[in-house]
UniProtKB/Swiss-Prot annotation:
Disulfide bonds: none
Name of the gene: rpiA
Pathway: Carbohydrate degradation; pentose phosphate pathway; D-ribose 5-phosphate from D-ribulose 5-phosphate (non-oxidative stage): step 1/1
UniProt record similarity statement: Belongs to the ribose 5-phosphate isomerase family.
Entry GO MF terms: ribose-5-phosphate isomerase activity
NCBIfam families linked: PRK00702.1 (NF001924), rpiA (TIGR00021)
TM region(s), chain numbering: none
Catalytic activity: aldehydo-D-ribose 5-phosphate = D-ribulose 5-phosphate
Protein name (database record): Ribose-5-phosphate isomerase A
UniProt keyword terms in alphabetical order: Isomerase
Length: 226
């Protein structure tokens, strides 16, 4: 039986096959953050010299990419990318996701928005029927912490400050347990409209286009409907 680490590697390898299909001297690849994204980054090293470069969703990923000799570009200098590859904390059959366990949710949303296709890589344990078992990360401007926490409580959540953590943008994270997420796009908009929220970790208004889920029997590929 494959371990979770081996399943993550399997998912990363499947995404690298997609990179092989689009690689070229003018191609830029968007790269996410997290343990599965780290494996993708390590595999991306073999494309050194075959890509124009990469765009990273966090300082952590940028450092790892640079360590492999891959060019890391400023998103302001990039007009489009064929794919953005990232993991997920949870993903449902609609390819809506909860992300942000690593705290990079805002930059992940920004970088993903510039890519033509969002490729989610994960092991099969991340696939759920309904989002919400994993606490929802919400990036918050520090002065708004308590006001935002009250707003999240009114939505039925139980927000908790992620102690000792500051995002790459200088903000804090509230991890929200207990939310009922029947309408992920609607809840994403509602939370994002709370003054002081930078963004929440629901990726539903713009979810993944393709999910590559590693199973004991190989890769299960899901594509967004419509």
């Amino acid at each position: 039986m494959l371990t979770q680490q081996e399943l993550k590697q399997q998912a990363a390898d499947a995404a690298l096959e997609l990179v092989e299909q689009v690689a070229g001297p003018d191609v830029i690849i968007g790269v996410g953050t997290g343990s599965t994204a780290d494996l993708f980054i390590d595999g991306l090293a073999r494309f050194k010299g075959r890509l124009r470069g990469t765009v990273a969703s966090s300082e952590r990923s940028a450092a790892r990419l640079a360590g492999h000799g891959l060019a890391v570009l400023d998103l302001n200098d990039v007009q489009s990318m064929p794919i953005y590859v990232d993991g997920a904390d949870e993903i449902d059959p609609n390819l809506h996701m909860i992300k942000g366990g690593g705290g990079a949710l805002t930059r992940e949303k920004i970088v993903a928005s510039v890519a033509r296709r969002y490729i989610c890589i994960a092991d099969e344990s991340k696939l759920v029927e309904r989002l919400g078992r994993f606490p929802l990360p919400v990036e918050v401007i520090p002065m708004a912490r308590n006001a935002v926490a009250r707003g999240l409580s009114r939505l039925g959540g139980q927000p908790a400050l992620r102690e000792g953590f500051v995002t790459d943008n200088g903000n804090i994270i509230l991890d929200v347990a207990g939310l009922s997420i029947a309408d992920a796009p609607g809840l994403e908009k509602t939370i994002n409209d709370i003054p002081g929220v930078v963004t929440c970790g629901l990726f539903a208004l713009a979810g993944a286009d393709v999910a590559l889920l590693a199973t004991q029997d190989g890769i299960r590929r899901l594509e967004r409907r419509g």
